[in-house]
Swiss-Prot record:
InterPro entries: DUF402, FomD-like_sf, Ntdp-like, RNA-bd_FAU-1. This is Probable ribonuclease FAU-1. Its EC number is 3.1.26.-. The lineage of its organism: Archaea, Thermoproteota, Thermoprotei, Thermoproteales, Thermoproteaceae. Belongs to the FAU-1 family. Probable RNase involved in rRNA stability through maturation and/or degradation of precursor rRNAs. Binds to RNA in loop regions with AU-rich sequences. It comes from Pyrobaculum aerophilum (strain ATCC 51768 / DSM 7523 / JCM 9630 / CIP 104966 / NBRC 100827 / IM2).
Length: 443
């Protein structure tokens, strides 16, 4: 039975599902203990699941067997978008420098190296993955050795550090341990993981001894490109409306839950949403329309988890479409249209409630249309944060010419998407659409 620690806005729903799937919940919060009446087990997890920064998904990190089992169950139940990293977190490898700040690792993957390190091109050494590569986003590796256990990590940083989730009183206790019985390891580099706050001293000391012997062995290195120590598997898992409806249903089987709960939770409603859950008020459409007033922030979420944020001012809901005006910064070039952005340029963005696209029409300082960019995406969620997941393929209209963009990029990453989202052009609108202050029009 794999042990999983779950945190964040999806915690109740995912806990309900994980228990049904046969996982053991460890290090539960007080709310989870109360809601599910489960055993209070504070042993280290095999797997951690927590919010993605977009609040429209989670990151999954842990031992690879537990990771694969959990992702399989997620896929069967939620049909989400899943972007797996191409290297493990804290994977240790022998690499060859291909620049002062780049190293080639296993499978020819090139990692960025933090600026505080300067490499000699052509030189080899031992590196640890700090940030794994996902999608087109490069990974980051440091010319240090880190060996991670359940409670501590030994590394070659020369510092003693603590997980941000360890409170001050526990840091004092663990700090004393580092200065006394762990002194020989602390002088090399020691990081206390969050599970250390639940462990007794003997457990920590025993683990540190084992990790130290492994660190010494890893310091001998290996041939360039060799994986010397496997890291934890990592993935970004994103939920669209369909996935969130399943999560809403799972949560509702444990505690009172209104329709649209998880979409509303991403809006940061706090106690207001707790009140809606308690009363059972079915007001999702009205609530998000109310929240979509004044300043809004559009979260354009890439399938690998990268978030592009666009600020705008909502002009209102016009004919069932949320219209947002966005100023454009002069100097750049309109993507896919090729027109240079001049002073006074702006975009009107039309966001339908129930379609799989968002329409951006660009205007010059004299209010003339410059071109239109249609982004194909998951069904948008309205609110003060407008959230959707990019399906990578786009269409543009400019100067009487229609273009389809980024098909090659979609083909490269289409395995991230469930089958139902693997033909994005079928989800695109027909006709030539423009976004105006009064909503969408067909030209």
């Amino acid at each position: 039975m794999y042990k999983v620690r779950i945190r964040g806005i999806f915690a109740t729903a995912l806990t309900k599902l994980a228990l049904e799937w046969g996982f053991k919940i460890v290090q539960p919060t007080g709310k989870i203990l109360q809601r599910f009446q489960i055993e209070a087990d504070y042993s280290p997890p095999d797997l951690t699941v927590k919010d993605h920064e977009s609040k429209t998904g989670v990151v999954v990190l842990g031992k690879c067997e537990a990771f694969e089992s959990f992702l399989q169950r997620l896929g069967e139940s939620l049909d989400p978008i899943v972007a797996r990293a191409r290297a493990g977190v804290k994977e240790v490898f022998s690499g060859k420098a291909v620049g002062e700040h780049e190293v080639e690792g296993p499978r020819g993957e090139v990692f960025k190296v933090p600026a505080r390190y300067v490499l000699t091109p052509g030189g080899t050494g031992v590196f640890t993955v700090v940030k794994p590569p996902v999608g087109p986003v490069s990974g980051v590796a440091a010319p240090e050795i880190a060996v991670e256990g359940d409670y501590v990590e030994l590394n070659t940083s020369g510092r003693v550090t603590f997980s941000e989730h360890i409170p001050q009183e526990d840091r004092l206790r663990l700090g004393i341990l580092a200065e006394t019985r762990l002194k020989q390891y602390a002088s090399i580099g020691l990081r206390f993981k969050s599970s250390a706050k639940y462990a007794d001293e003997e457990q920590i000391i025993k683990e540190a001894e084992v990790l130290y012997r492994e660190l010494l062995q890893l310091s001998h290195g290996g041939p360039p490109g060799a994986v010397l120590r496997r890291g934890n598997c990592f993935a970004v898992v994103l939920f669209d409306r369909r996935s969130k409806e399943v999560l809403d249903s799972a949560r509702a089987s444990a505690v009172p839950t209104v329709r649209g709960h998880h979409a509303l939770r991403a809006q940061g409603l706090g106690k207001c949403l707790d009140l809606l859950d308690y009363t059972g008020a079915d007001v999702y459409e009205k609530a998000v329309e109310f929240l979509s007033r004044g300043p809004v922030l559009i979260y354009h979420v890439k399938p690998w988890g990268e978030v592009v944020k666009m600020k705008g001012e909502a002009l209102g809901v016009k004919n069932g479409v949320l219209v947002v005006k966005r100023p454009l910064k002069p100097g750049g070039v309109l993507d896919g249209i090729g027109v240079r952005i001049e002073r006074g340029f702006y975009a009107l963005t039309c966001i339908p409630r129930d379609a799989n696209y968002v329409v951006h029409t660009y205007y010059d300082g004299s209010n003339n249309v410059v071109g239109t960019y249609i982004n194909i995406n998951t069904t948008p969620e309205w609110g003060r944060r407008v959230i959707y997941i990019d399906l990578l393929v786009d269409k543009t209209y400019a100067g009487g010419v229609e273009k389809v963009l980024d098909v090659d990029e979609f083909e490269k990453y289409k395995e991230y998407f469930p089958q139902r989202l693997r033909n994005p052009l079928q989800l695109a609108p027909s006709g030539r659409l423009e976004c105006t202050a009064e909503g969408l029009v067909v030209r």
